Structure formats: C-alpha cells, structure tokens
Design a protein with these regions (language model features):
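Conserved PLP-binding active-site segment in aminotransferase class I/II-type PLP enzymes
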Residues: 1-68, 72, 128, 142, ...
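Alpha-helix N-cap/loop-to-helix initiation residues
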Residues: 12, 62, 84, 108, ...
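Structural detector of well-ordered beta-strand residues that form the stable sheet scaffold
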Residues: 53, 78, 99, 152-154
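Flexible loop residues that form catalytic
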Residues: 57, 82, 131
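Alpha-helical elements of the RecA-like P-loop NTPase motor core of helicases
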Residues: 63, 88-89, 136, 140
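Conserved PLP-anchoring active-site segment centered on the Schiff-base-forming lysine
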Residues: 65-119, 127
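Active-site phosphate-binding strand-loop segment of PLP-dependent enzymes
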Residues: 106-164
Length: 164
C-alpha cells in the first residue's frame, strides 16, 4: 500500500532564497518593512479589501477579534468541534461560553444546519474555519443569518487563504 503523507512540507527554492536574502539584510524582524507593505498592497489590490491588518499568526488575529467584539461572560460563541485549539481558546479567555458545533464527516466542517441549531439569543459570534484549502459553500447564507441576528461572523482562513 502506498503511503499518503498528510501536510508534507513543500520547499520552494525561491521562498528559501527570499528568506535567506531577508535574514542576510539585517533588517528588523518586526514592524512595517518593505515586504509587509508589499503584501498589504497585494491584498488590497487583488481581493478588494478596504483595510488590511496583518498579524504574526491566526492565533493573534483571533485574539484581536475576541477583544474587538467585547465579549462578556454571558455571551456565547460557536466554534467547530474539529479545529486548532485557538479557534476556541482565543475567545475562552474573555470568559464567554464556547459552544462546539458538530462537523460533517465528509468536509470536517460544520454544516449550516448544525450551526443554526447551536444559535441562541446569547450567541454573539460564530467562528468558521475554512479547512485544508476548502471554504464552506454556504458562507453567503451564513452572512445573512448573522446579519439578521446581529451575530459577528469570524472567518478563520489560515488554512485556506484565497480559496472560495
């Protein structure tokens, strides 16, 4: 039986050369360097975003989201039952209740039906994780539900950037 590797690292020579060039340049590893500014411009141009705020990780981005929406201990947030730990822990630190939503066996993501069944009057946010390069196929419907119920929709696309 042939072995199938999960998350086998991909080494692209140009990426290795760019990292090497950057490290040799002795430029700071933080702040708005020229590469960060290039990435921001690329995102603004190619995706039509109004604003771009880059972070060092999806964990940081989710923690910023949890603070930005001002969660209280009486609030609930819905997250997929199968995801990286920070999908929940970034919000748990606010004291809110985390509701884990069942996923579908085929997609490893929650269905719209499963998410809808988790929503209560206390739901303040829903975290959707676009997993392994795949986006959920019901995002527009979910946006409408969230808008009608005044629920924040947070999309974690760390594993599926640019997919649709």
């Amino acid at each position: 039986m042939k072995e199938i590797f999960f998350n086998e690292p991909l080494k692209i020579k140009s990426s290795i050369n760019n990292v090497k060039k950057f490290l040799i340049s002795n430029k700071p590893l933080h702040g708005p360097g020229e590469n960060i500014l290039k990435i921001k411009q690329l995102l603004l141009k190619n995706f039509g975003f109004r604003n771009v705020f880059l972070t060092n990780s999806c964990t940081s981005a989710l923690e910023i989201c949890s603070l930005a929406i001002n969660l209280k201990p009486s609030d609930e947030i819905i997250v997929p039952s199968f995801s990286f730990i920070t999908s929940a822990s970034s919000f748990a630190r606010t004291g809110c209740k985390i509701k884990f939503c069942d996923i579908e066996k085929k997609t490893l993501m929650p269905s719209l039906k499963n998410i809808s069944s988790c929503i209560t009057k206390k739901t303040r946010a829903i975290v959707i994780v676009h997993y392994q390069g795949y986006s959920v196929d019901y995002i527009e419907k979910l946006k409408k539900i969230c808008n009608s119920k005044k629920i924040f929709l947070i999309e974690d696309a760390a594993q599926a950037f640019g997919s649709y």
